[in-house]
A protein has these predicted regions:
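Membrane-interface transmembrane helices that cradle and orient dolichyl/undecaprenyl
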Residues: 11, 224-241
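Alpha-helical transmembrane segments of integral membrane proteins
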Residues: 21-26, 78-85, 183-184, 221, ...
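Hydrophobic, membrane-inserted alpha-helices
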Residues: 26-35, 86, 138-145, 166-167, ...
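Structural signal for the C-terminal ends of transmembrane alpha-helices
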Residues: 37-39, 53-67, 93, 173-177, ...
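Membrane-interfacial entry segments at the cytosolic side of transmembrane helices
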Residues: 68-76, 178-181
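Helix-loop-helix transmembrane hairpins and adjacent membrane-interface loops
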Residues: 74-99
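Active-site lumenal/periplasmic loops and adjacent helix-entry segments of GT-C-fold
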Residues: 93-228
Length: 241
């Protein structure tokens, strides 16, 4: 059977949505588990970890019979690898990994990763102050950095963000019912209406907000988890389920 086109119709079962859900839960929850283990006493971390595991435990439910379902096809096709590579390039050229010129916001981001890699957890500075920041995005890469060094942590930051973007794209495909490269482009390029307003020379009220690409450049640590969570949530509300 010839492989489907890049925008071939794609119901949930064609993605092996169970595996996709587990990948998404792992991406969202692994930093939480690392935080529980690294920042909290065991008598607080253990019950919270057990509660998290209980919430993820599969439950038996009656599944509606599916009719006329299309045969599943491999997820990792050439088009999928192209999207994965494009997201990796987006992360790298946005400054993550510290290999290209960075937005000034990365001064704080880089320092956060270095402290998480080099300092014991929880991070307490010599003057008694503690590291208070939205550190979740860096925790898994920083844990790898403690084992393999800061360079390994930088590489994993890029890979971690790339995988989060890739999962977001997959859930967009589930949401729309099609595996489409255009969805990846729209997701990455979705931006402010202020650009259109400026191009047309309209002196109206400001329609500005930070687009996806700008958010990834400045704050992928905050924007990618939110993007993935809400696309995942919206996809779960589709009539397909």
């Amino acid at each position: 059977m010839p492989p489907p086109a890049a925008d071939a119709p794609c119901p949930e079962q064609a993605f092996n949505a169970t595996a996709l859900k587990w990948h998404t839960c792992a991406w969202l929850l692994l930093p939480v588990l690392v935080f529980l283990a690294g920042w909290m006493h065991w008598y607080a971390a253990l019950p919270l970890t057990l509660l998290t595991a209980a919430g993820l435990a599969p439950r038996k439910r009656k599944e509606p019979q599916k009719k006329n379902s299309l045969p599943s096809f491999p997820l990792f096709t050439r088009s999928s690898f192209f999207v994965l590579a494009a997201f990796a390039a987006l992360m790298i050229f946005s400054g993550w990994g510290e290999w290209v010129n960075q937005h000034p916001d990365h001064i704080v981001r880089n320092a956060c990763l270095r402290e998480l890699v080099s300092s014991p957890w929880p991070v307490i500075f010599p003057d008694g102050n503690v590291l208070i920041y939205n550190t979740g995005f860096w925790l898994v890469p920083a844990l790898a950095g403690k084992l393999a060094g800061l360079d390994a942590a930088r590489v994993l930051v890029v890979l971690w963000g790339t995988w989060g973007l890739f999962l977001s794209w997959l859930w967009l495909c589930v949401f729309s019912g099609r595996r489409s490269l255009l969805l990846a482009l729209l997701m990455a390029a979705f931006g402010s209406l202020l650009n259109l307003q400026c191009w047309l020379g309209l002196n109206l009220f400001r329609l500005h907000y930070f687009g996806t690409a700008e958010q990834i450049m400045c704050s992928a640590n905050a924007s990618i988890p939110v993007l993935l969570f809400f696309i995942f949530l919206a996809s779960g509300r589709m009539p397909l389920y």
